[in-house]
C-alpha cells in the first residue's frame, strides 16, 4: 500500500513538473497551429486535438493541486482548466444552426452549422416583418409549434434574443430581386431593361443553444482576474528590479509603437464601421491587443538587440526587461482575448467557436505562455529565448493579418472589410 502511495506521489511530481508542463504547452501550440492552417474536418485531426487538450487539462489539474495555496496562481490556472473542460464536455452539447427568414412565409427549418445539408426544427418558427440595412436589424415574430405568436421583437447585431433556451443572433441579410408582370401591383419599373421588379429581403440568423455557458463564464472570470494579478505583480516586480533609465527607454519605445499603430490602424478612425464592430467591447478589445502587440514587439526587438552589447551586465539588464515585458504583454493579451470572447457571445451567441482568427489567437497566446514558463528559473537561455520570441512574433503577425489569406479563414466570421 505504501509503495502504491509513493508511486502515485512520484507520478504527480513528474506530471506537475516544469518539463511535462512545457512539453504539453508546446504540443497544444502545435496542434492549434495545424488547426489554424487548414480547414478542420477530419476525424483523425479532431482526435489528436482533443487528446492533446485533454492531457493539458490533466496536467493543469495536477499543477493546481500542488499549488493550491497560491491565490493568483490558482485564479489563472483553475480558470484555464474550467475553460478547457467546458470546451471538451460542453462543446458536444452545443447546437448551432443557420436560418434564413423572409417576409412572405414563416420559416420553421434551420440547417446545421457544420453540416448545411442537414435540416432540423428548433421548436419554433420565425417570420420576418422588416429589415433595416443600416443597422442590420430584423423585426421578427416568433411562433410556437401550434402557430401561436409568442414574441415579436427586434434582433440586432451584438444584441441577440433568447427564445426557449436558444439565442437568436443577427448575422447578415440577402437581397433578392423578382421580375413582376404588373408595375402598379408588384414593384418599380427598371428603366434600363424595361421590366418591372420587386425587391425582397431575407434575414440570415444564427441559432445557438449552449447549456454550459455559465461554466464558461466562471472560467473566463477566473482567467480575467488571474490576468489582472499577473499584470499587477509583473509591474511591481519591474519597478523593483529595473533601473529607471533602462525602463524609461524600453517603455518609451513600446508606447511609441502603440501610438504609431493606433494612428495608422483604419478601424479606429473610420467614421462608419460595420454593424458588428459597433459594440462597446470594440474599443477596449482593440486597444488592449494593440498595446500588447506593441509591448511584445518591443520585447522581441530588444531580445535580439541585446546581442550587440559586449557588456554582459547590460545584456542581463535587457534580458530581465524582456522577461518582465513579456509578462506584461501576455497579461494584457489575456485580458483582451477574454473581452473578445464576451463580445463574441454578444455577436454570435458563443464565447469561443475555434474560428480561424480565434485559433491563431490561442496559438499565439500559448507560445508566449511557453516562453514565460520556460524563462522562469532560466530554463532556456539566450539565444534560444530570442529565437522563441521571434517565432512568437511571427505567430502574432499571422493572428493579426496573415490569417485572412489562409484557406481556414474562408468561412471566418472575423474576416470582413471594416
Spell out what each predicted region is.
Residues 1-418:
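Solvent-exposed, non-transmembrane regions of integral membrane proteins
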Amino acid at each position: 500500500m505504501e509503495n502504491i502511495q509513493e508511486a502515485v506521489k512520484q507520478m504527480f511530481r513528474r506530471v506537475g513538473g516544469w518539463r511535462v508542463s512545457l512539453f504539453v504547452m508546446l504540443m497544444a501550440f502545435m496542434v492549434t497551429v495545424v488547426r489554424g492552417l487548414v480547414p478542420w474536418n477530419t476525424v483523425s485531426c479532431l482526435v489528436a486535438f482533443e487528446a492533446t487538450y485533454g492531457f493539458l487539462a490533466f496536467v493543469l489539474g495536477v499543477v493546481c493541486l500542488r499549488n493550491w495555496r497560491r491565490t493568483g496562481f490558482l485564479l489563472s490556472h483553475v480558470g484555464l482548466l474550467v475553460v478547457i473542460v467546458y470546451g471538451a464536455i460542453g462543446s458536444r452539447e452545443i447546437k448551432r444552426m443557420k436560418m434564413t427568414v423572409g417576409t412572405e412565409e414563416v420559416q420553421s427549418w434551420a440547417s446545421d452549422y457544420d453540416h448545411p445539408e442537414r435540416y432540423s426544427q428548433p421548436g419554433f418558427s420565425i417570420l420576418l416583418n422588416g429589415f433595416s440595412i443600416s443597422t442590420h436589424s430584423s423585426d421578427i415574430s416568433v411562433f410556437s409549434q401550434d402557430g401561436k405568436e409568442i414574441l415579436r421583437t427586434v434582433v440586432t447585431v451584438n444584441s441577440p434574443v433568447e427564445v426557449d433556451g436558444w439565442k437568436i443572433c443577427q448575422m447578415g441579410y440577402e437581397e433578392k430581386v423578382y421580375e413582376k408582370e404588373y408595375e402598379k401591383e408588384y414593384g418599380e419599373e427598371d428603366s434600363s431593361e424595361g421590366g418591372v421588379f420587386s425587391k425582397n429581403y431575407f434575414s440570415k440568423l444564427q441559432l445557438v443553444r449552449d447549456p454550459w455557458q455559465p461554466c464558461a463564464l466562471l472560467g473566463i472570470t477566473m482567467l480575467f482576474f488571474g490576468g489582472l494579478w499577473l499584470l499587477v505583480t509583473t509591474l511591481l516586480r519591474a519597478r523593483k528590479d529595473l533601473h529607471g533609465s533602462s525602463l524609461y527607454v524600453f517603455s518609451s519605445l513600446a508606447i511609441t509603437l502603440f501610438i504609431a499603430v493606433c494612428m495608422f490602424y483604419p478601424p479606429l478612425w473610420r467614421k462608419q464601421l460595420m454593424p458588428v464592430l459597433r459594440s462597446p467591447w470594440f474599443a477596449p478589445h482593440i486597444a488592449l491587443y494593440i498595446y500588447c502587440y506593441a509591448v511584445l514587439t518591443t520585447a522581441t526587438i530588444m531580445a535580439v538587440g541585446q546581442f550587440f552589447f559586449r557588456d554582459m551586465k547590460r545584456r542581463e539588464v535587457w534580458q530581465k526587461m524582456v522577461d518582465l515585458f513579456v509578462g506584461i504583454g501576455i497579461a494584457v493579451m489575456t485580458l483582451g482575448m477574454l473581452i473578445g470572447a464576451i463580445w463574441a457571445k454578444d455577436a454570435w451567441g458563443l464565447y469561443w467557436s475555434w474560428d480561424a482568427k480565434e485559433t491563431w489567437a490561442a496559438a499565439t497566446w500559448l507560445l508566449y505562455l511557453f516562453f514565460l514558463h520556460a524563462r522562469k528559473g532560466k530554463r532556456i537561455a539566450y539565444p534560444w529565448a530570442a529565437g522563441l520570441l521571434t517565432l512568437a512574433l511571427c505567430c502574432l503577425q499571422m493572428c493579426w493579418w496573415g490569417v485572412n489569406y489562409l484557406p481556414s479563414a474562408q468561412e471566418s466570421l472575423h474576416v470582413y472589410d471594416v
